[in-house]
Amino acid sequence: IVHTQGWIHCHSSATDASGLVKAIMDELFDYFVKFKLESKLKIAVGCCINMGGAVHCSDLAVVGVHTKLPKVDNTKLKATCEIPSTIKSCPTGAIRKNPEGDGLVVNKERCMFCGNCY
């Protein structure tokens, strides 16, 4: 099983792969050690959609995906984020300056839940 370490190094991870890999291997262990499979099986666990876990070249892949729109707390934003960097991190342009005042807004229709802004 190929996997990434998720939260240790990835800024956009949706999960940490270590627990998932342990659970998968606990279930499949007998298949691997007793050679019950017809051929080699490549399994990958990716923490995000950026393919750090080689999910694109595996037979079976488990990928963590963000499913909720990022929440913006405009009262804490200036103390925790570089606003221009946060805006630029969005590949679809879903994050914009708030036209009604300070802070940012997220366009729900444009957000692809990549996690770059987290």
Please annotate each region the language model reported:
Residues 1-80:
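Small-residue-enriched alpha-helical segments and adjacent helix-cap loops
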